[in-house]
Amino acid sequence: VTGIEALGEVLRRHRRDASLSVELVESGPRLLPGLPPALDADLRRLCEPYAVNFRTATAIAAVSAQGVRLAEGTRLRSELTLWTAGLAPPPLLRESGLARSAQGWADVRPTLQSRHFDNVFVAGDAAQLPRAVAKQAYNAIDMGALAAANAARFLGGRALQPFKPAPKPVLVAFGDLQTYLVAGRTVLASQVLAAAKEGVHQAFMLQMAPGGVVSALPAAAGRLWQSWRRLALPQLLSLADFRKLPDCKPVRRL
């Protein structure tokens, strides 16, 4: 998702620059491999007017100041390379003994308790559950709350509770060209949804505000209003823009 959203922001700012040429390299078989396949086709359609070339099922061997070398030997010259690859476990996990598997993440039980140290609980991207969950902010926040609660239960000699990931919709912003709401196999697309994505982001940030929700609320409300004014209001007169991608289940129009 990060690479696609970065491309959207590049096109937002520079798509009218005739000298712009973009190569997007994806190791997976298609764009956004963890989301419905129709997103791949729709993103490619949106990029047709611009000098964007997609290379899927392609691995990168090296990155230098001059460009990128692909695993199959091709060299892509670049004035600017944006690296938006996925996650890598920090060495601390293995050095501390929390991670002992080949993947390098901290091995935890369903309760987020370390498999190697009973008095350690691990939350967020660092935790490797028996049944993998998406390494996303919404899961990390829920895991943090459960880890704290389970630590208290552990100290009190009470039974620990397992982590149960709650299914949540995903919002993918593609600059000012499109925003997608993905809920399971259902996808809704509209530029109006860009403000909704900002709203979700601000809601997550409020949960982690150092001074608490009340003190952070005015600033968050101001940022949300700015995004609504810039991103949503210009589109409200054209609600017909809401559309469903072709291979997804029918959904009620917003």
Give, region by region, the residue ranges found by the protein language model:
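A conserved short coil-to-beta-strand element within the FAD-binding core of flavoproteins
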Residues: 56-67
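Glycine-centered tight beta-turn/hairpin loop motif at sheet-sheet or coil-to-beta transitions
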Residues: 71-73
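C-terminal auxiliary extensions adjacent to catalytic cores
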Residues: 176-254
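A conserved FAD-binding loop/helix module that cradles the flavin
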Residues: 93-94, 126-175
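FAD-site-proximal beta/loop scaffold in flavoenzymes
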Residues: 75-142
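Hydrophobic/small residue at the entry helix of a nucleotide-binding pocket
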Residues: 2
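Rossmann-like dinucleotide-binding cores of NAD(P)H-dependent redox enzymes
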Residues: 6-58
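FAD-binding beta-loop-beta segment adjacent to the flavin cofactor pocket
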Residues: 104-121, 160-163, 176-187, 193
